[in-house]
């Protein structure tokens, strides 16, 4: 007996029924792409109506765009100038390298593990590259290779090798502003003091250009330079020169000569942020002026203050142990 063939005509109503149900569910659940069903929309509307004003504002608020701030007028000091008083800190990796940099292992990873390793990070140099002269770029590369060397044989050579930070030297400008330590701005009408936690560094910015008792030119080269300032609207402009040539911009060996000239701009753009810019000029090292920029953040911890950083005590044996009556072996 031959096997009976399936009656496909009988299957047609079932197929049509399944198709119709699928279309019904599709239209009911999602009548328009991106919209909830009517009942769900009604529930959502009820929930929206029940929101507090704060919740409603948060739901419609735009996320901030990095690098952009809404208009802001900083509070004023008694003499009408923008009030920059406070403790500030940068949160960038520029102290490692002011240009874009990859992560690197630290010295002796077999002993130190991850301690001393360099994290990767974005640079703060506008345009991405420092415009070195060819011979100066070769010196920068030599600095990078010798950044961990501290081979002191006499005071005549103590600046020749090693990152100055390694030896706890005063960091210089602008490096002091982006090291991983806070600093405090203490603002007065005729001068501004900036105290840095690292190496107990200090700067005085003279604000009264008409005061004839204050030299208009640096009386001597110093680690932090000679600084004069003025306000341009809400921006503090600080002009510094008269630097010793011994500081670096970072651990990567970026450096300058004693012809360094730095113009800094501090603009408070919110109660908690200062946008910092520095234009750097040194005709002995660079082919043209160049600029760096980054935000500074107000430290808001209760009772925040600078702490004593006895950096010198950490390196006395390293630098001068050979002169000790009982040198360590």
Which residue ranges define each predicted feature?
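PEST-like low-complexity, intrinsically disordered acidic/proline/serine-rich tracts
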Residues: 2-3, 13-329
